[in-house]
Amino acid sequence: MARKIGFIGVGNMASAIIGGITSSKGTVAFEDIVLYDFFSEKCAAFAENGAQVVDSEASVAQSSDVIVLAVKPQNFPEVLSALSKVEGISQKLIVTIAAGITVETVSSSLHGAPVIRVLPNTPMLIGMGVSVICRSDVANKDDFEFVVSMFKASGSVVLIDESEMNRYISVTSSSPAYIFAVIKAICDGASAQGLAGDTLMPAVCDMVIGAATLLKEGGKTPDAQIATVTSKGGTTERAMAVLREQNLYGMFADAMQACTDRAEELSAK
């Protein structure tokens, strides 16, 4: 018998998950999905395909076997309070995708319910996400494998201990924004040199995809790949000297530490 999967919050990440599990790589029918969002219009497209839309968090819990909490961290206290009043909530499998919200926080608020914590990222929207997953001791093997299969439908999965979770936010979850910023910086630099046109950003994006694929599959370290591009006295050497002078690596390290610090602050609340 198919599990009913409920979503509380139907923003970009929830939409990406739903898109994955109902795609050709997934195994879930729209009829087995239950949705609630304060802004009900977010559910409309999924409802047209057969998903059930309900009017409260409690209704999601009552109608689902698996509950995906896809709300912002600041909305968690209200959502957990509503769910804690639902009879049988401790028997539901809870999946949380919020930054900084621990398994213990969710499970203890829901009378010991099994909880699996996931850090997805926005490239899930095109089936190329990276989802970092951990679980609680009360989540059994079947539950864990089910959740892993859900997220594999939208990309790759990394399994870690929860103690590493907040640090991984800076590595895979928030980090697409860093790459978007790098792409924007390259495009802005090109514009400053008088380059423009519809082909500029697609060319930069293809370059980033190609460079990342070469690094992943080429069997060389980042420094070794940099060396393959760099000729003594050449253009790349001059460009890299400026990046080092401007402390590019230090800026990234500082940004990642700030990201982790904020996740720790959210965990402490």
What are these regions (language model features)?
Residues 105, 109-114, 130-168, 178-217:
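Internal alpha-helical scaffold of NAD(P)-dependent oxidoreductase catalytic cores
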Residues 115, 165-170, 222-227:
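Short pre-catalytic strand/loop immediately N-terminal to key active-site residues, enriched for Gly-Thr
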Residues 33, 43, 60, 196-203, ...:
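Small-residue helix-packing motif on alpha-helices
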Residues 29-32, 90-92, 198-199:
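Short acidic capping loops at alpha-helix termini that bridge into adjacent secondary structure
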Residues 1-55, 59-62, 109, 191-193:
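NAD(P)+-binding Rossmann beta1-loop-alpha1 motif at the extreme N-terminus of oxidoreductases
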Residues 49, 57-133, 137:
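Rossmann-like NAD(P)(H) cofactor-binding subdomain of soluble oxidoreductases
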Residues 205, 209-269:
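NAD(P)-dependent Rossmann-like dehydrogenase/reductase catalytic/cofactor-binding core
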